[in-house]
């Protein structure tokens, strides 16, 4: 009788352990599914951001109006990129071509690239800027203002490295 009771106790203990293991497994599966769902939402959101980033970059047909012999190699490390290229006609008819590498990779870099393109477009649309130096100076001022930087050590060091070329297309 004592041996049967011991066996019954061990069986109940094993059943309890089995239920706990199954409960832990179910929890792990729910957490895995939740993480997978969150990852999908984040990836979908970043893909949508990629479409926005592509929309602000010059299109091939736009580039063809300014340039005849060119190529574009744009390969983001992540879905979105901190790199950008830009081309426009200045008020005096010359062409400005920019290639930039913004601080940060992925989403932070993409934010900076969209900021850079937007500010460049604003400078050309609303200010009389016709030299590469003036354009870069104005862009620098506007990036500092947009990021609320004051030149202090504790400021973020966000920005961009840019090559800017102004050419006479005639």
Tell me the role of every PLM-derived stretch.
Residues 2-3, 9-10, 16-17, 23-24, ...:
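Acidic/polar-enriched heptad-repeat coiled-coil alpha-helices
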Residues 26-170:
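… and, occasionally, acidic/histidine-rich disordered N-termini of signaling adaptors
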């Amino acid at each position: 009788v004592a041996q049967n009771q011991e066996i019954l106790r061990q069986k109940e203990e094993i059943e309890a352990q089995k239920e706990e293991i199954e409960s832990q497994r179910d929890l792990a599966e729910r957490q895995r599914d939740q993480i997978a769902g969150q990852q999908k939402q984040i990836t979908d959101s970043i893909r949508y951001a990629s479409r926005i980033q592509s929309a602000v970059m010059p299109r091939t047909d736009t580039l063809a109006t300014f340039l005849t012999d060119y190529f574009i190699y744009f390969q983001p490390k992540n879905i979105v990129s901190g790199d950008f290229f830009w081309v426009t006609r200045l008020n005096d008819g010359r062409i400005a071509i920019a290639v930039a590498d913004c601080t940060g990779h992925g989403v932070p870099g993409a934010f900076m690239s969209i900021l850079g393109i937007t500010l460049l477009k604003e400078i050309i649309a609303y200010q009389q800027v016709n030299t590469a130096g003036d354009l870069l100076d104005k862009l620098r001022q506007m990036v500092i203002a947009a990021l609320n930087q004051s030149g202090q050590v504790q400021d973020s060091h966000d920005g961009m490295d840019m090559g800017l070329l102004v050419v006479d297309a005639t």
